[in-house]
Amino acid sequence: YMGKKRIYVALCLIALAMLGICFFYLKKTGWGMTGDKAWNELLDLDKNITLEQLEAKGYINVTGCLDEENETISEFIDNAGNRRPAVLRLTSNENDDLCAKILLYDKDYNFIQMWTMYPNRQQAVAPGKCFSTDVVSSDKDGVVTVTLKNIQNPTVPTEEILQDEMLYKWKK
């Protein structure tokens, strides 16, 4: 009788561990992330937050030109291109102006949406800019520039001025 109980307990623990792993993986892939959550996460950023603190929260620093291709960014682009859930957090500090962005792949409309916040000056940029999942990479003098093509947001009928977004640069 004791042996059966022990096996049962062990099986329960294994099941719990697997659930934990699944949850962690889904969180990493952006499952359950919504535009509202992305927006609120940015609005909740402290006015005195630093680049280092954003990096600690999982934001990728894309200031300037990176020394190599970033795997997390490439994975995000690949997932969005293959209609898989994807979320990407970026930060940069160009001209001493700290910026935080959350990009989210929207499966319903098959596009990438972006939310942008400048926490130090507590300024948010018009939320939910839309981009095509066909990401453009151009190589010039050994520097690869990865650009998102801005597309019309199908849920907002207003004609907006489309502006492509440079995601990041890296040296080949």
What does each model-identified segment do?
Residues 2-16:
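N-terminal Sec-pathway targeting helices
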Residues 16-27:
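Hydrophobic alpha-helical membrane-insertion segments, chiefly the h-region
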Residues 1-2, 23:
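General helical secondary-structure elements
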Residues 25-172:
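Mature, Sec-exported extracytoplasmic domains of Gram-positive
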